[in-house]
Each structure stands twice: as structure tokens, then as C-alpha cells.
């Protein structure tokens, strides 16, 4: 007999925010319940907060629709950020020169799973 699935995940790829900045937000919600994590994200004044909230809501929707899990029982079991491809640009400088600018992107993954009993 197949095992019962107790987790669901969502990923946002190539988001135009540096992974270092997203990690500050991700670290706030790891291990929290879904309701608490969404409340934290709503009141966190960082540019990555709405993006992480969107990924979290997507993971919850995946859990509800694909695996029939209850929203109240879900916790953020895993949340991590990886670096995406870097967009390389040039900024004009004095005397006809130019400096390289790295526009960094990130891949955001959030995994929600049911609370452990006990």
C-alpha cells in the first residue's frame, strides 16, 4: 500500500532579488505554522516578503488541492533559497569607461508538511 503524502512544496524560479536578501526573510518563517508565517511576512518590511508569501500560499494550495491536507495542520518544514542565473550589465563611468554590474536572481523553495503529533 502506498504511503500517505504529508508534505507539499512550491518553487519560484529566477526571482529578481539577491539570494542573500531573501535568506533574511526565509529564516524568519522556517519551522513556524502557516498562519504565523503569513502574519510575520505581512509585517516584515523587506522587498522579498511579498514574493516569499506568494510561494508559501502556493505551497499551501498544493497541499490542499493535490494531497487533501488541512491548512490548520501545516507547518513550514523546509524553506531555502538558491542562487539563480546572474544578469551581467555595465554601468557607464567617467572618461568613457564602464563598470560591471551583477543583477542577481534567486530560486525560492518552500515545503509545508503536517505537524508531527506529540
Swiss-Prot record:
Q: Which Pfam families match?
A: Ribosomal_L22 (PF00237)
Q: Does the keyword Signal apply?
A: no
GO process annotations (BP): translation
Q: Which GO terms describe its cellular component?
A: cytosolic large ribosomal subunit
Q: Which GO terms describe its molecular function?
A: rRNA binding; structural constituent of ribosome
Entry keywords, A to Z: Ribonucleoprotein, Ribosomal protein, RNA-binding, rRNA-binding
Describe the protein's quaternary organization and the partners it interacts with: Part of the 50S ribosomal subunit.
Q: Which family does it belong to?
A: Belongs to the universal ribosomal protein uL22 family.
As for what it does, the entry says: This protein binds specifically to 23S rRNA; its binding is stimulated by other ribosomal proteins, e.g. L4, L17, and L20. It is important during the early stages of 50S assembly. It makes multiple contacts with different domains of the 23S rRNA in the assembled 50S subunit and ribosome.
Q: Identify the HAMAP family for this entry.
A: Ribosomal_uL22_B
Annotated protein name in UniProt:
Large ribosomal subunit protein uL22
Its lineage opens with: Bacteria, Bacillati, Bacillota, Bacilli, Lactobacillales
Amino acid at each position: 500500500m502506498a504511503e500517505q503524502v504529508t508534505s507539499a512544496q512550491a518553487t519560484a524560479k529566477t526571482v529578481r532579488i539577491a539570494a542573500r536578501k531573501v535568506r533574511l526573510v526565509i529564516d524568519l518563517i522556517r519551522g513556524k505554522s502557516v498562519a504565523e508565517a503569513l502574519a510575520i511576512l505581512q509585517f516584515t518590511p523587506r522587498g522579498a516578503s511579498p514574493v516569499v508569501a506568494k510561494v508559501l500560499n502556493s505551497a499551501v494550495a498544493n497541499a490542499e488541492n493535490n494531497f487533501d491536507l488541512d491548512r490548520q495542520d501545516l507547518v513550514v518544514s523546509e524553506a531555502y533559497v538558491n542562487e539563480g542565473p546572474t544578469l551581467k550589465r555595465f554601468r557607464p563611468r567617467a572618461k568613457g569607461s564602464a563598470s560591471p554590474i551583477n543583477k542577481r536572481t534567486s530560486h525560492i523553495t518552500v515545503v509545508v508538511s503536517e505537524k508531527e503529533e506529540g
